[in-house]
């Protein structure tokens, strides 16, 4: 049996007024927030999809369908904790995470340390096991036009 598994995740949400911006479980000061059924934390969603994908367990929509009112406004860190428990129950643990958040604004670098700490606490990791990079889309496409924010994540799982 393979002792390592790798998963890839992606998420994108539209930026709108009257919502808070949450990335990696941290509220980021900005005049716009992400629209979604839950808190629309694209970074945490991409990480969850990568974790699930590594074990061929589908995606977060399967476990937390947007059609189910019980997930309305859900804190993505609560969902991440459930996905983490799902992989732990199958005998796997997270080895490391590498991720990229793509946004024209706001500048995310000042918040990356807090995001890493918040995610590490949920996943029982050291902060240095979580890489978070921030970049822009060079004003190209919907993210470049500041219509949304997206995130990519790669997760390495290790058999316990």
Swiss-Prot record:
A Pfam family it matches: YgbB
Catalyzed reactions per annotation: 4-CDP-2-C-methyl-D-erythritol 2-phosphate = 2-C-methyl-D-erythritol 2,4-cyclic diphosphate + CMP
Claim: Lyase is one of the keywords in the record: yes
Cofactor note as given: Binds 1 divalent metal cation per subunit.
Example of a GO MF term: 2-C-methyl-D-erythritol 2,4-cyclodiphosphate synthase activity
Binding-site list for a divalent metal cation: 11, 13, 45
GO terms for biological process, alphabetical: isopentenyl diphosphate biosynthetic process, methylerythritol 4-phosphate pathway; terpenoid biosynthetic process
Binding sites annotated in the UniProt record for 4-CDP-2-C-methyl-D-erythritol 2-phosphate: 11-13, 37-38, 59-61, 135-138, 145
Keyword Magnesium part of the UniProt annotation: no
Assembly mode: Homotrimer.
Function: Involved in the biosynthesis of isopentenyl diphosphate (IPP) and dimethylallyl diphosphate (DMAPP), two major building blocks of isoprenoid compounds. Catalyzes the conversion of 4-diphosphocytidyl-2-C-methyl-D-erythritol 2-phosphate (CDP-ME2P) to 2-C-methyl-D-erythritol 2,4-cyclodiphosphate (ME-CPP) with a corresponding release of cytidine 5-monophosphate (CMP).
Family to which the UniProt record says this protein belongs: Belongs to the IspF family.
Protein name: 2-C-methyl-D-erythritol 2,4-cyclodiphosphate synthase
Organism: Nostoc punctiforme (strain ATCC 29133 / PCC 73102)
Gene that this polypeptide is encoded by: ispF
């Amino acid at each position: 049996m393979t002792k390592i598994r790798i998963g890839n995740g992606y998420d994108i949400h539209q930026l709108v007024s009257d919502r808070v911006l949450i990335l990696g479980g941290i509220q980021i000061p900005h005049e716009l927030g992400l629209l979604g059924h839950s808190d629309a934390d694209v970074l945490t969603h991409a990480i969850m999809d990568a974790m699930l994908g590594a074990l061929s367990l589908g995606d977060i929509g399967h476990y937390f369908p947007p059609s189910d009112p019980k997930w309305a406004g859900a804190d993505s860190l609560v969902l991440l904790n459930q996905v983490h428990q799902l992989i732990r129950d199958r005998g796997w643990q997270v080895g490391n995470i590498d991720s990229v958040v793509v946004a024209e604004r706001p500048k995310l670098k000042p918040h990356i340390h807090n995001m890493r700490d918040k995610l590490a606490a949920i996943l029982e990791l050291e902060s240095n096991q979580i890489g978070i990079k921030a970049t822009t889309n060079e004003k190209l496409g919907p993210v470049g036009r500041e219509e949304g924010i997206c995130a990519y994540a790669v997760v390495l799982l290790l058999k316990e």
